[in-house]
């Protein structure tokens, strides 16, 4: 049997390790309902912000300063945040951490596929797992599928035949984020 709080590590890492939970210190006990509403709003706003960041970096050709294109990015980012998943999971605010981390993981995959540095992918996966290990794991599974999409899309338009290098590179970088989180098991 676990003692000295050992059983609490699983509870903490599943329910409580979101950085937004630190905001609870700013609220009185009587304002708990307000706190939950603020957290939901902040997490959905963070989802919109990370998706806008993803769109700006992934589709750099959109960054010509055009008001129409920036309005489209804002529209798509807000649409992502208030999608059915985002609204439905407002009842389970712990799932929203993976929701706002997903665009950063997608951008990390894009950068690795296109020969960029893998730091963003590793750090994003590590943070997603840190914030909620279950959704972080789901995000890792999605990252594998997203890699296949980005890889196929990239090779379709570039005609690059040196695919093995990218395939060999993506798996360790995705796993690095998981390895960073191994401290929880000790």
What are these regions (language model features)?
Residues 56-68, 112-116, 156-167:
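Membrane-interface helix-boundary motifs at transmembrane edges
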Residues 159-186:
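Hydrophobic alpha-helical membrane-interfacial segments at the cytosolic entry of transmembrane helices
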Residues 44-54, 69-153, 181-186:
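Membrane-embedded helix bundles of polyisoprenyl
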Residues 28-39, 64-76, 117-120:
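Membrane-interface starts of transmembrane alpha-helices
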Residues 22-27, 58, 112, 130:
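Alpha-helical structural context
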Residues 25-28, 125-126, 174-179:
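Membrane-interface segments at the starts/ends of alpha-helical transmembrane spans
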Residues 1-48, 78-99, 138:
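Membrane-interface coil-to-helix junctions
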């Amino acid at each position: 049997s676990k003692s000295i709080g050992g059983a609490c590590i699983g509870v903490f890492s599943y329910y409580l390790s979101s950085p937004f939970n630190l905001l609870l210190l700013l609220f009185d006990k009587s304002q708990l309902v307000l706190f939950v509403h603020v957290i939901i709003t902040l997490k959905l706003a963070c989802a919109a912000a990370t998706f806008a960041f993803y769109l700006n970096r992934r589709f750099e050709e959109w960054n010509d300063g055009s008001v129409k294109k920036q309005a489209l990015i804002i529209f798509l980012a807000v649409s992502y945040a208030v999608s059915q998943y985002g609204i439905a999971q407002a009842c389970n605010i712990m799932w929203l951490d993976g929701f706002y981390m997903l665009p950063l993981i997608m951008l990390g995959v894009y950068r690795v596929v296109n020969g960029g540095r893998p730091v963003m992918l590793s750090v994003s996966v590590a943070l997603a797992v840190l914030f909620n290990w279950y959704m972080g794991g789901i995000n890792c599974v999605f990252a594998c599928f997203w890699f296949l999409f980005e890889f196929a899309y990239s090779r379709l338009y570039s005609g690059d035949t040196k695919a093995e290098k990218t395939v060999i590179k993506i798996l360790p970088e995705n796993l690095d984020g998981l390895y960073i989180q191994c401290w929880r098991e000790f």
